[in-house]
Amino acid sequence: MAKTIKVIRKKDPKKKNLSDPLAKQKLVWKIGHVLTLVFGLLFSITYFYHVLIFFKYRSWKWLFLRVNKNYSFIQSKRWYMKLLSWSPQVMYRLSLIGVFMSESVTMQQNWVGLNPTWNDLLSSENFHTLLIACLWFFGGGKSFYKILPYMILSYLHLTKMNYELNANKEEKIPLTPKDRKMLHLLAYSELLVILALTLDTILFKTGTSGFMLVIYVGIYWLRLNFSPYAQVAVLELLVKFEKYVPKKYRDKWQVIKNFIYMKMKEHEKRTEEVARYA
């Protein structure tokens, strides 16, 4: 009797990803960060070009503080030119949609199998990021400074993409000196948003600037309580400007510094507890 030959079929490497239950989520995560970075950069180009031609839509009689709302960058009345004039707004929205996509996947993975409380969500940096993105998406007014933190964050995630998608939750992502500088820039860019919103409120740039400033400061207060890089950035600023503070206010200044120190210690303690019971 002839022996039967058992045919062993090799798995197609292209079909390997189909067996990954998280393949779709990883794809959404990658697309989200790409949208944020690409459309954020494209919007930034249009934004700074608009800044360079400020003299065309701002009156010198009002020290360039008053904006001519009837001015249009594209003067043609053709329908396709009208659509083109909306391109900065579309790019701005698409960059924020990318934030919704990537952060939603990250939060879903962080809380899978769990039932997070409101306290858990309010202490989550990813939830803060989503809240701020919703504020910019629905609050009106587009600005480079508002999406700059998201572009930096997406750049960091995409450069570490292969490691993040394949590493276990317990593994820490190695940070290079360049990554630390980018995180430092990210923290300061979030503080820059407060300054930009304050100027918009003082100059009455939009009718909602004041409300957005109050809401953003409220969310940033949460970040200051739970985000280590935000705490480090604020503490560095407090130390830098301490020498300019009058002596009679030094005690109050020290109280603020002690508060930041306390929050940093609490974060270290929480991290140690999580590592211990993980």
Swiss-Prot record:
The keyword Transmembrane helix applies. It is a multi-pass membrane protein. Residues 56-129, 202-205 are extracellular. Keywords: Cell membrane, Membrane, Transmembrane, Transmembrane helix. The keyword NADP does not apply. Residues 1-34, 151-180, 223-278 are cytoplasmic. The chain crosses the membrane at residues 35-55, 130-150, 181-201, 206-222. GO terms for biological process: endoplasmic reticulum tubular network organization; membrane organization. GO terms for cellular component: cell periphery; endoplasmic reticulum; plasma membrane. Its main location: membrane. It is found in: Cell membrane. Signal peptide: none annotated. PANTHER family: ABR032WP (PTHR12703:SF3), TRANSMEMBRANE PROTEIN 33 (PTHR12703). This is Uncharacterized membrane protein YGR026W. It comes from Saccharomyces cerevisiae (strain ATCC 204508 / S288c).
